[in-house]
Each structure stands twice: as C-alpha cells, then as structure tokens.
C-alpha cells in the first residue's frame, strides 16, 4: 500500500504565522501513605501553615500576654525578638499548655495558664495562626511580656473574638511602638518582626510592579564578584565557556566561604539575626552551597562536574597522588563480575581509605604532595595517557547496561553484587538539645534512634562517630540519568580515575560504609524516595555527604510531597540546586530549596512564611527587599540573552516559532461538531444545575475527545455516561466506569493538578465520586478526617478502601485495540508529512522532533514515515531506561543512515535531555501548560546547537486547540506575575477551572 501526500484538499491549512523568536516503583498500599506521627505530645508550630489557604489570612488583632517559667529553660530572647508558639496538649500539668520557643528551637517558657486556656482552643481548631514577639526580653528573670498576633480567615474572626471574650480577653490594634520599631529597623540595619505592619494598611503594589520585580529578581544580580573567572582542575577535558568559569569561581567561593549566612551579623561576642532579633554565642553555620539557576541549555551539568573535581577540600582538587591501598570493594571480590561499561577509570584520593588495587601514577603535572594548591592544577595538561575506565554499577535488568551507555564510555565496567546487610551510620549533627529540635532539625536516622528508646545524648554520640565522607551524591530524574553518565565520559579526561556508582535498581548496593568511600553516587528522586519510605534505615540517609547536588531541583517544590521530605532529610556539608526554573508557579516554590540549603531560620516553614512569603504576597516592599537580598546572596542566574563583557553568554542560533493552522476535512469536521454539540449540551446542564465540578471528569473526557479528533479520529475514545456513579451499579460495573474515567484523565495529556497539593498527579487514584487525586494526598485527608472524610471537591463521603488505581494492563489493552484498527491518514498527519518530505528534499541531513502528548498518535504517525522511507526512532514514557538511552544515541549519531526523525512524547522530552542534533520541531498538539512546551523546545535549542531552530505548532482552526492557546497566554501572564500575586485558594481554583471550561467549550 502506498501513501501520497499532495497539496490537495485533504491537508488544507492556512498561511504560517510567526509569533516570536525566542521508574519502576512498586505499588504502595493505603497504609503506606498514612502519616507516621512521632512525639504525639508536640504539635509542630507550622502545622497550620500546611493549609492551601495560608495566604488568605487576615490580621484579627493583637493582645498582650506573659511568658512564665523562664528560670526552668535555657532559651533566651532579645528585645523585639520573634518567637514561635507551640501547643503541648499532652503536658502532664496543663492540657492547654503552649510552649514559647526562640528561633533556634530552644524553649523559653510557657504562656501564662489563664491565657493558654483561651488560646489553646483557637490553635487546636486552626481558627487562627498565633504568632509572638517579645518587646522586652533581654533582662527578664521570671516572666516576660509577649505580644500575640492573630491571623486567620475572615469567616473565623467572630469565633476567635468570642472565644477570647469568654475568657476575659480582647484583641486590639498592633501597638505603635511595635510598628515603629519595624519601620526603623530597615533604616538602622536591625529588623523587627515582619508581621507588625498590618496587611490591610500596606501600600499594595500594582500587578505591573509585581511583574517587573519578578522579572528582575533573578536577572538583576549584580556582577561584582561574579565576574571573576576560574579555570577548572586539569582533570576536566572540555574547555569551559566564560560564564561557566564564572559559575565555577562563584560556586567554589560559596563552598569555601567563611562569611556569615544572610541576615546575620556579629555584635561584640554575639551573632544577631537582623530579621528576627535572635542572637546566639555560637557562630551560625555557613551555607556552603546555593542555587545555580542558569537558563536551560547553558551547561549547568558541566559546571557541576567541574566543581566536583576542582574543589574537594578547601580549594584542592579531588585528584591527588595515590598510594598502594586496597580496592574499596575488595570485600566483595568473590561477587565481582566484570563487563564492558565506560571509558573512565576509578580514581581515589589520598585522604580516603579507598583506592584502586596497586599504585597508580599521578596525572602529569600533578605535584607529588597531596596538599598542592588549586593554581598548580588549574592548567590543562598537555600530555594525556589513555587508561581504561571503570564504572561500578549494580547488576539488574533495569539497570543501565552496556548497550545503553554512550559509545564514548564503552570500557571496563565492574559490576558489584552485594548480599551483606551491614549498615554504617555516617556522621550527623544534632542541631538542638531538645525533642522539639529533633522533631524539626534531626535526620531520619536520629529520629529513628530516638524512637527506639535511645537517649538524646546516645543519639548524638552514635551519629557523630562516622568519618568524613569523600562522596558527592547527585540526584536527578530518571530521564536524565544516562545524560549524567554521558557527561562524565565526555568532559572528564580518560586518565582520571573515579569511583562512580549508579545507585539504581533492585540489586543496588546498600552498604553505607562502601557507598561513602566512592567519589560520586548517582541516583534518582524516585529511588531516594522509595528508600526513605522503607522500614530499615535508608543508606543514603545514613551518610553525611561531602556534597549533594539536586539536578532539576524544582522537583522538590511541593513541601508536602514525600519526595521533598526525603531530600530534606539528607545530611551534607555542601548543597547545590541546579534548576532553570527556581520559581515555577509562585513564591512558595522557593521554601523547599532554602530548607534544603539549611539556611536558618528558613529551615522552619513558619519563619519563611512570617518573614518572606506573607510580606511579599501582601505587597510589603520590605519583604520584597528581604527576598531580593536573600536570592542575590545564594543564587547565580544567567539567561541565554545575558551578556558577559558585552557579548552574549551563549551565542545560540535564532529560535523561531510558527503556528501552522490546519483545516479539518469535511468528514473530520462533521465528527468534531457532533461530539462538541453533544458535550456542550451536557455541560450546559451541569452549569444550570451547579454540578459542573462534580462532573469534572466528564468535562475532561469531552475536551479529550475534541482534542483527539483534531489529531486523528482513530484516537476518539468511547463516549462516557454523563451521570455519576449510580447506586444500582454493581461493584464491577462501578469499578469499570471509574477506571474508564480515570483512563481518560490520565491519557488527556492535561498534566492535571491534584486539588489537594496543587501539583501534578503522582500515584493517581480515583474516588467513588469520580475525582482523581494523588494517592498520598487523599490518604492523608482520609486519615485526618476519620471517620467521616469528605471529598475535597464535591464533599461526598470517601473511604480509603474505595480508592481505585488504573492497572497498567488496562492501559495496554487500549493501546492494542488502537493498533488493530485499519490505518488512515488525518489532516494533521498530511500536513506533517508534507513538511517532512519538503524538508528532506531541501536537506536530507536535517533532523526533526515530532512531539505529541498522545503516544497512540505517535504510533499512527509511524506508518506513513515507514512508507515514505524515513529512518526514525522514538522516545516516550513507556520505554525502559535502556531503550531510552539507545534511542537518544541513535538520534544523536551524525553518521549516514542514522535516524532523521524522533517521535517524542511531550512529557518524556520535557526534562534534562540533550537533543541538539535536531533543528526542527513539529508540535502536533498544544499543551495545557505552556512551560511544558518551552522545556521540550529547549531540548534542541541549547549549548551545542549550531543551526537555526524552527518550531512549528499545528493548530486546528475553529477548534478547542485555538481556545487552548488563549488559556496558555493567560497561564504565561500568571506565571510572569506569580512572584507577587496571592496564591489561589480552593475556591479560586474551582472558579478558574469553571472559567477555563467556559472558554474551551465556547459557552
């Protein structure tokens, strides 16, 4: 059978319009996601702040109270110091007890019993967030005054006032002395409590002002010391570009910095936090790290590799002369299997007990002494000796095997299997001498020790016995795991010996003592999270790492996600976040990053919220200045348009984006209009009845069918019942209907958000009322609201036992069903094939990405590609890691006969891939989230691209796709101004969804 692609009416489209340049995780049970509470006698002070509505709080007023029992506790406070109020419901002397803690987590005392009796009810029922500041605290011996400020939702104001009145108290305005102290603080360099300036009297910044400040936040970083360039250690093969040398100098300066952290200064013998007025005798711990927020495609990975090899110890490189020592894996010698792997050898350092067997000569030009200076090793070595490279990986079918490693890295691979169950705890640091401190600052290992009955002293001693590790831990998404391996092989000289271990797969080595002696451990967020959730100690959490690097670090932006909690529990001397998008949705995205960097007092979410987030989002310019000062201290960001010495940071070829309008054929338009009219009538009824959100799955189903028709009528799914679950349905009928609805949502490509965490769905499950949530999120809701938990969207009763997952085999069935249908073309496929054939005629060597959210559509496109003689490859989320690597290698190959087309799913192509072999992108269907498109485009418009990049978006005229572009523009505007806009609450989110539905369906 032949296929003809002509300029006939079957592929009609209008003139192009240019609008700009520019793992396999095991299933977990319901109980897995139930919160495991330790220290039930203490309620964390930031518990109230975990609400999605935290930014809708208004100031109710202030009342004066007293802190008593000062002589019994070690915590001290200064004048005008902010303090945290924390409920202690299991206090044996007073069930209403409220602790007062200073910023460091040390207890100062308790709120006076009479006041606590009134306030405890308010805190327990989350009617208000109660915050404290001590106006005069420095010289008090027995009691001290305390101003308590109440913030809450407007609808709770009267309940709070009545509760206080019942106990003889009332709220008043914030004292002028407190307000004036704040206003004077910034002039004098001493900050007062950020909350004392009420939100309702603040001068609200306009949307344009906020947008401008957001745009400038990362781009206004003054060059000052950041223009200094530094050459990497001679172990680096690839010459660094000027902006990478600047980043290297800045990052090493940050790692070796002896400066005080932001907002700290020394006054006589004390160290003061100028924001909270807290002081300590001990010098605050330095922040050895930061955020490298360079734009996507500017070579952050190479910069990070240069830091690892250049700065091992106080400016000395990781490389030094090695002696005759045992191989770190000698104890597993009998279990060692050799196979081909990479072109880099293991390399050891004289400071560690690990070394290759026998004596290895040092690199030419390396001083004999291990105490050599950085400058002695900064020049590129003229002589190179080729020595085979060894990698250490776990053996497993899911691991990256020989065939999936880059060609440049084929060499000797030592594969170590481990059956031992030994554990060695790495050194850790107990931050404070109290259970409170352990609750908030201790590592997972410390808390588990404490839970097992060990005393705090024993816990501290046990965790401090480990030796200093040499290892850097790199955590990345699975999709870029192979890219890191490739980058090490490409950028590190072959004569350099590294102990490099990929911690991935079920047979991964779990011996923390052995892991700590490697140079580099590479793993994924999913593996880290999985280990963190296991009953035994996670080996990665048992080590105090030399350095932890988070690639695509914005992955931890959701503070409630298990993934974020797993990352925050890691112990390390130095910490780095690599991300091109540090703020994706709103200012709250930054807290997890700052918490990871261990920047006190922002480790505690309450202080972040009181000092930065709330002031900024309510338009307080002081809060904005604090945020800018903080960001400028710990962040380096350059965009593709940034300039160094008058020249662009990266001279990339131009990127052009075109919209190619498509006109549906008469048959396609008829089907489209029929489905639209039927769905429009049903949705109209939902609006009339006020049940549109209760039928949200049905609405998504309609939108999905319309989008599928725009691509190909074969994608059209079966119609769904517009009614919800019926009481007459049998359990099996109900299950089938719910699974069908869930499949529609999961296959819609909408990147649908969970209404609880407001993030993309992870471990999606569907309730009996047909709403889809993240499994961890909905399980926590059910647990906290037992026994009468209600759906967050429709308020119907829900139960953990009734949550349904979509079995992978059912999704596979749908795919098989599609492949059995007789193939035919569509208007979009005709337009694509015409463009590809025309492109091949002009230049047969040009490579293209064909991108779609629908993997079944990509399968349909394969047929005409084969018929027209195109050599192509494919990359989508259903492929195993080995297949992904092979596909990328084939596509990046420049030899004759290599694929000129890659069929790419939008999600698989959104993170970390380097596909700069392609210079043409054809986006077959628009995404709900425009950022997802931009990330995909940056896979080829990045460092290494030599040709002009042309992107073509296929959009069907007079269709839901055109309306999606309108919503995309709205989302772009919101993203640009998200820095200063208020975070949407649940009601705003619902209304936004309703408005989007009206726009999409033309209601």
From Swiss-Prot:
Domain Helicase C-terminal: 831-990
Catalytic activity entry: S-ubiquitinyl-[E2 ubiquitin-conjugating enzyme]-L-cysteine + [acceptor protein]-L-lysine = [E2 ubiquitin-conjugating enzyme]-L-cysteine + N(6)-ubiquitinyl-[acceptor protein]-L-lysine
Domain of life per record: Eukaryota
Biochemical pathway: Protein modification; protein ubiquitination
Region (Disordered): 317-373
Motif segment (DEGH box): 551-554
Protein name as annotated: Helicase-like transcription factor
Species assigned in the record: Mus musculus
Encoding gene per record: Hltf
């Amino acid at each position: 059978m032949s296929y003809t692609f002509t300029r006939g009416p079957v592929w009609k489209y209008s003139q192009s319009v240019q609008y700009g340049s520019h793992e396999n995780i095991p299933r977990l049970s319901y109980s897995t996601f139930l919160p495991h509470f330790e220290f039930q006698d203490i309620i964390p002070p930031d518990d109230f702040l975990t609400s999605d509505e935290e930014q809708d709080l208004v100031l109710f007023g202030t009342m004066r109270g007293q802190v008593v029992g000062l002589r019994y506790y070690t915590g001290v406070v200064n004048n005008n110091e902010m303090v945290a109020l924390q409920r202690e419901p299991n206090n044996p002397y007073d069930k209403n007890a409220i602790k007062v803690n200073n910023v460091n987590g040390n207890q100062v005392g308790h709120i006076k019993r009479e006041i606590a009796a009134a306030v405890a009810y308010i805190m327990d029922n989350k009617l208000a967030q109660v915050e404290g500041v001590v106006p005069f605290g420095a010289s008090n011996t027995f009691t001290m005054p305390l101003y308590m400020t109440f913030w809450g939702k407007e609808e709770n104001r009267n309940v709070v006032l009545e509760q206080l009145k019942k106990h003889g108290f009332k709220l008043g305005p914030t004292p002028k002395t407190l307000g004036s102290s704040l206003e004077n603080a910034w002039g004098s360099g001493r900050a007062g409590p950020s909350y004392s300036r009420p939100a309702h009297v603040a001068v609200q910044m306009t949307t344009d002002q906020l947008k401008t400040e957001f745009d400038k936040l990362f781009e206004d970083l003054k060059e000052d010391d950041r223009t200094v360039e530094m050459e990497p250690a001679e172990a680096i093969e690839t010459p660094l570009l000027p902006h990478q040398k600047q980043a290297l100098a800045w990052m090493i300066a940050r790692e070796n910095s002896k400066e005080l952290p932001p907002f700290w200064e020394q006054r006589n013998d004390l160290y003061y936090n100028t924001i909270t007025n807290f002081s300590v005798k001990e010098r605050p711990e330095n922040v050895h790290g930061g955020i490298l927020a360079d734009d996507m495609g500017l070579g952050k990975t190479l910069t990070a590799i240069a830091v690892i090899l250049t700065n091992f110890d106080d400016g000395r490189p990781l490389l030094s002369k090695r002696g005759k020592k045992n191989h770190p894996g000698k104890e597993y010698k009998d279990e060692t299997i050799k196979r081909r792997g990479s072109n880099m050898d293991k390399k050891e350092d004289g400071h560690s007990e690990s070394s290759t067997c026998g004596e290895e000569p040092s690199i030419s030009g390396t001083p004999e002494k291990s105490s050599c200076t950085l400058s002695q090793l900064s020049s590129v070595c003229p002589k190179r000796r080729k020595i085979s490279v060894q990698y250490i990986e776990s053996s497993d079918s899911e691991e990256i095997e020989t065939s999936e490693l880059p060609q440049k890295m084929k060499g000797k691979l030592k594969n170590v299997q481990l059956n031992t169950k030994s554990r060695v705890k790495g050194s850790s640091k107990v931050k404070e001498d109290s259970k409170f401190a352990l609750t908030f600052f201790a590592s997972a290992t410390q808390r588990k020790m404490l839970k097992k009955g060990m005393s705090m002293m024993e816990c501290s001693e046990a965790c401090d016995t480990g030796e200093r590790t040499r290892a850097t831990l790199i955590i990345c998404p699975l999709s870029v795991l192979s890219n890191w391996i490739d980058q090490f092989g490409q950028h590190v000289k072959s004569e350099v010996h590294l102990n490099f271990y990929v911690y991935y797969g079920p047979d991964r080595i779990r011996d923390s003592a052995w892991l700590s002696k490697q140079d580099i451990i590479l793993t994924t967020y999913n593996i880290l999270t999985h280990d963190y959730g296991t009953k035994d100690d996670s080996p990665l959490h048992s080590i105090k790492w030399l350095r932890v690097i988070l690639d695509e670090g914005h992955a931890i932006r959701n503070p409630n996600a298990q993934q974020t909690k797993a990352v925050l529990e890691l112990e390390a001397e130095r910490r780095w976040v690599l991300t091109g998008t540090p703020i994706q949705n709103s200012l709250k995205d930054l807290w997890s990053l700052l918490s990871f960097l261990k920047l006190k007092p922002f480790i505690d979410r309450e202080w972040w919220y009181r000092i930065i987030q709330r002031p900024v989002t309510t338009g307080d310019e002081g809060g904005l200045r604090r945020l800018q000062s903080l960001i400028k201290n710990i962040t380096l960001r350059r965009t593709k348009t940034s300039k160094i010495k008058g020249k662009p940071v990266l001279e990339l070829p131009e990127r052009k984006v075109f919209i190619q309008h498509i006109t549906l054929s008469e048959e396609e338009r008829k089907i489209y209009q029929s489905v639209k009219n039927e769905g429009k009538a049903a949705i109209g009824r939902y609006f009339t009845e006020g049940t549109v959100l209760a039928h949200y799955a049905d609405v998504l189903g309609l939108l999905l069918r319309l989008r599928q028709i725009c691509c190909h009528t074969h994608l059209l799914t079966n119609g769904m019942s517009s009614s919800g679950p019926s009481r007459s349905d049998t359990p099996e009928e109900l299950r089938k209907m719910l699974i069908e609805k869930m499949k529609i949502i999961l296959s819609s490509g909408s990147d649908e958000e969970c209404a609880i965490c407001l993030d993309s769905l992870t471990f999606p499950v569907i309730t009996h009322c047909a709403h889809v949530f993240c499994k961890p999120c909905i399980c926590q809701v059910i647990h906290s609201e037992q026994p009468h938990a209600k759906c967050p969207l429709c308020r119907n009763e829900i139960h953990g036992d009734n949550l349904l997952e979509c079995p992978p085999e059912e999704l596979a069935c749908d795919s098989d069903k599609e492949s059995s249908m007789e193939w035919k073309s569509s208007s979009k496929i005709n337009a694509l094939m015409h463009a590809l054939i025309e492109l091949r005629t002009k230049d047969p060597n040009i490579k293209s990405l064909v991108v779609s959210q629908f993997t079944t559509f990509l399968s349909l496109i394969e047929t005409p590609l084969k018929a027209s003689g195109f050599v192509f490859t494919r990359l989508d989320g259903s492929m195993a890691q080995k297949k992904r690597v092979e596909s990328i290698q084939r596509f990046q190959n420049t030899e004759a006969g290599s694929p000129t087309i890659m069929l790419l799913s939008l999600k698989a192509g959104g993170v970390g891939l380097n596909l700069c072999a392609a210079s043409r992108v054809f986006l077959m269907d628009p995404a709900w989230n425009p950022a997802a498109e931009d990330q995909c485009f940056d896979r080829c418009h990045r460092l290494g691209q030599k040709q002009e990049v042309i992107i073509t978006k296929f959009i069907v005229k007079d269709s839901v796709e055109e309306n999606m572009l309108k919503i995309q523009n709205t989302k772009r505007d919101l993203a640009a101004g998200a820095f200063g806009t208020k975070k949407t609450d649940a009601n705003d989110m619902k209304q936004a969804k309703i408005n989007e539905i009206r726009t999409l369906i033309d209601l």
